[in-house]
Amino acid sequence: MIGIIDCGGANLKSLTYALERIKLKYRISKVWSDLSNSRALILPGVSAAGNVMSNIRKLALEDRIRDFNKPVLGICVGMQVLYEHSDEENKTCLGLIPGVVKKFSNPKLAIPHMGWNMVNFLTSEFEDCSGHFYFA
């Protein structure tokens, strides 16, 4: 079973639809005892890093997520809070991934980027993966 952490603001309907299409069982909860036996966690989010971290702390999930020792997938801002810090609202995050989430500073980039675009990988280990990808 996949545990989906409901910390508010996420598009859970789209996520659960995707999991159902690939026939994965899941449970959505804000309560750790419902999620602790999951084989993996998904942390979705639509909001700002500060809001998501505030909700995680209110639900007493911060240390639980850190100590989970199984795969954790972050989607959208859920991915951002897996890092150590976010410059958005200057927030300390979960620290599962070393690094800081920073705003793109190039004014020529359209942010957020939506639609198809070519992706070219700079390392040889991913060169066969280059191609067109859809960004949402």
Predicted regions and their residues:
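Short acidic low-complexity segments
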Residues: M1, Y26-N37
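N-terminal beta1-alpha1 ligand-phosphate binding loop
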Residues: I2-L24
